[in-house]
Design a protein with these regions (language model features):
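Acidic (Asp/Glu)-rich catalytic clusters
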Residues: 5-11, 31-39, 69-76
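Structural preference for beta-strand elements that scaffold enzyme active sites
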Residues: 14-16, 39-43, 78-80
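Ligand-binding pocket scaffold of soluble enzyme catalytic domains
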Residues: 32, 41-43, 49, 111, ...
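Mid-to-C-terminal alpha-helical segments outside catalytic/metal-binding sites
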Residues: 95-131
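Active-site glycine- and acidic-residue-rich loops that bind
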Residues: 17-28, 48-66
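Short acidic/histidine-rich active-site segments
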Residues: 45, 75-93, 114
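Charged helix-capping and loop-helix junction motifs
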Residues: 2-4, 29-30, 59-67, 95-99
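Divalent metal-binding pocket/active-site signature
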Residues: 1-26
Length: 131
């Protein structure tokens, strides 16, 4: 939150708070909203739903798709979704994104909300479209 505020103060136009749903430093709803209010984009990584026992990353607790969708629902117009995949013993990144999109839709997010997070917002961040 402090870095998000400072980035805005010094004039950074685009910045991303990554892994907001990570078990290591899982952000609260209020923390996420405060970062967004400071101009941040929020990134949620679906790897949290794929790691755990029986995977290439067995030491981490798996998040439920319902909980992940709850994070994504906070502000889809200011969020991006990644898989953070590519590790040995984990699904291929494309398969991970496929699972993520399916989980978001099955947990009540609209197709438009999903499009914001996996298409429109990432394109905006890298300058391929205008807000």
């Amino acid at each position: 939150i402090t870095l998000a505020r400072k980035a805005r103060e010094v004039g950074v136009k685009k910045f991303v708070v990554t892994h907001a749903n990570s078990g290591i430093w899982k952000m609260t709803y209020d923390q996420i909203k405060r970062c967004i209010d400071s101009g941040a984009w929020i990134e949620y990584s679906y790897i949290t739903n794929l790691w755990g026992q029986g995977t290439g990353l067995p030491d981490f607790e798996r998040m439920s798709d319902k909980e992940f969708a709850g994070f994504a629902r906070i502000a889809p117009e200011h969020s991006i979704i990644t898989t953070d995949l590519g590790q040995v013993g984990m699904p291929h990144p494309v398969e991970g994104m496929r699972r993520c999109i399916r989980a978001l839709l099955e947990n009540g997010l609209s197709q438009q909300q999903v499009n914001y997070m996996v298409c429109d917002n990432p394109a905006t961040l890298v300058g391929l479209s205008a807000i």
